[in-house]
Structure formats: structure tokens, C-alpha cells
Amino acid sequence: MTTTTERPDAPIRHDWTVAEIQAIYDLPLLDLVHRASLVHRAHHDPADIQRASLLSIKTGGCPEDCAYCPQSAHHKEAGIGRQRLMPVEAVLREAEAAKAAGATRFCMGAAWRQPKDGPEFDAVLAMVRGVRGLGMEACVTLGMLTPSQAERLAEAGLTAYNHNLDTGPDFYGDIISTRTYADRLNTLQAVRDAGIGVCCGGIIGMGEGVADRAAMLQVLANHAPHPESVPINALVAVAGTPLAERPPVDPLDLVRMCATARIVMPKARVRLSAGRRALTREAQVLCFLAGANSIFYGERLLTTANNEADADAQLLRDIGVPVPGIEVLEAAE
């Protein structure tokens, strides 16, 4: 009997069970990647791998206690102090440079529990308007939002709001105690209600089981519509955080997550995000084959190191993906 996982043109579903998703995740890897690739090609151009740039516009001092995050004020040994919000002009200069290097999406992150209405939130709105004025997609991650804040971001032209679930509901309490799962879901609903695209994914390698990974994907896949984009992150274990001693993620687990996300959310952009620096070129290509179609471009992801831009450009060239921004810059030299 043909199942939905075997049909790349199957109807979009919003009624997945955790057991169904875990069964997909646990398929023999070659079968899983093949099925995911068929779904991917039915809904996306395989040569379209978006390059997004991510900038920390306000670093450190976050009151949340996320066990993986060096920006938490609870993890002082991580050595990241509280910094002020960057000036609007400085952020837009970074956006211009990212665009010149070929990025089409500019993401801005602030280490807040929730933004306060006032001058700083107004500055973020100006940043969003400025990025959109450059012809780029704009995404921000600012913590929890009120409905009115989401509406103001929508009016400023925000393309997407990032607010990750991090993990499945049952494991969540082992990672974070200062914000509930319901808090996260409420922010996602406010974003949807404002008409902003949802960017929402999670992190693997924090000690969760496969069932927790499947449960996180189930929450995402049962939203209607599916998230506009789904970042898949591998833990970057940072000294001074509670997860500093976690072992590295098996690259094939990252491939499985990308493939499973692609199958259950066929039209979403699957973003191969944090932890990519630890992958070989071949492992990255396998993730692309399995349905990942975005990377973060630039040598930092908030406060952790990322792949070198030149190496990324060469990898994309080698697999036949156009990299117009880099080619324009090289032609001008």
C-alpha cells in the first residue's frame, strides 16, 4: 500500500502523530533521503539554496535560563557580557554588506525575554523597514511578543519572526525553566495572527531522544499553515553553559532531521543552521539532498563561529548552485 511518505505529491497534512513522524525518522537512511529528495523536488528547485545572514543586534544579559545559550545571564562563566542595542545605521550597514555578498534574507537577533515598547522597539522597527528597503527579506528574533507588537512588526514589513520551540514538549523542561512551551506557542500564534511568516525549528544534541525530536516536528507540522521556514540546529556546546560537555551530534542525525522535516512540511524552507561548521562538505551536501534549502552565510551566528563565506561559496559552486553575490564581487576586483 502506498503511504504519504512514498508520494511526493501527497496532500499537505496537519494531522501527523508522533509515531508516524518517528517511523519516518527511523527509516533506513538511504530510503529516507530518497523519499525526502522526491518530496523536495516536487515542491522546490533543488538549486535554490537561500543564503541568509544573521546578526546579533543586542548581545548578552538575557534573563532566560536556556541551558544551551551563552547569552543567558544565568551562565556568567560563558563570558558574554550584556551589550546595548546596536544603532540602526550600523545594523543597516551590516545588511548592505550581507546583500553585496549574496544574502537575500537578513536576520536580526536580540537577547531579550520580551521587547519593551519604547525607543528600543522603535529602533527595531526602523531596522526592519531599512532591511526591507534594501530589497531583502527581514527576520527578527526578540523573544516573546504581544499581539500589538506583532502587528507593529507586520506594519514595518517584517517577512518572518523566528521563535524556536527548541525541542519536544516532554523534554523542554530539562532545558528551560523561565519560559513555558505555552509561552512559545502563544507568541507563534500572535505572529500568525499578524500575518507574519513563522520561522520555527529546534536544536538536536541536547540529550533528547528520537521521540522528542519527532514530537517537536509534530507540533510544527500540525500548525496550519506550516511554518514558512524551519531551522534545524545541532547543539554548539559552549564552555560555561550547562550543556558544555555534551558530545557532538552525529552528522547523520542532522541529515535525518532535515529529511523528516522536509517530508512532513513539504513547502517550508528547511534551514541548515547552527552546528553546520562541524559538518564535512559531504555531510552538508547530503543535507541538501535530503531537503535542506537554506544556510546562514557569514562567519558568525550570533555569538558562535560559522563557516567561512568563501568556503560556502565554493561548496555551492561545486554542487551547481549559483552564487551571484560572490560572483559580482569577484568580477569587480
Curated annotation (Swiss-Prot):
It is an enzyme of class 2 (transferase). It catalyses: (4R,5S)-dethiobiotin + (sulfur carrier)-SH + 2 reduced [2Fe-2S]-[ferredoxin] + 2 S-adenosyl-L-methionine = (sulfur carrier)-H + biotin + 2 5'-deoxyadenosine + 2 L-methionine + 2 oxidized [2Fe-2S]-[ferredoxin]. InterPro entries: Aldolase_TIM, BATS_dom, Biotin_synth/BioAB, Biotin_synthase, Elp3/MiaA/NifB-like_rSAM, rSAM. One of its GO terms (molecular function) is 2 iron, 2 sulfur cluster binding. Its cofactor is [4Fe-4S] cluster; [2Fe-2S] cluster. Keywords: 2Fe-2S, 4Fe-4S, Biotin biosynthesis, Iron, Iron-sulfur, Metal-binding, S-adenosyl-L-methionine, Transferase. Pfam families: BATS, Radical_SAM. [4Fe-4S] cluster binds at residues 62, 66, 69. Residues 47-276 form the Radical SAM core domain. PROSITE patterns: RADICAL_SAM (PS51918). Binds 1 [4Fe-4S] cluster. The cluster is coordinated with 3 cysteines and an exchangeable S-adenosyl-L-methionine. Binds 1 [2Fe-2S] cluster. The cluster is coordinated with 3 cysteines and 1 arginine. One of its GO terms (biological process) is biotin biosynthetic process. SMART domains: BATS (SM00876), Elp3 (SM00729). Homodimer. Belongs to the radical SAM superfamily. Biotin synthase family. This is Biotin synthase. The gene is bioB.
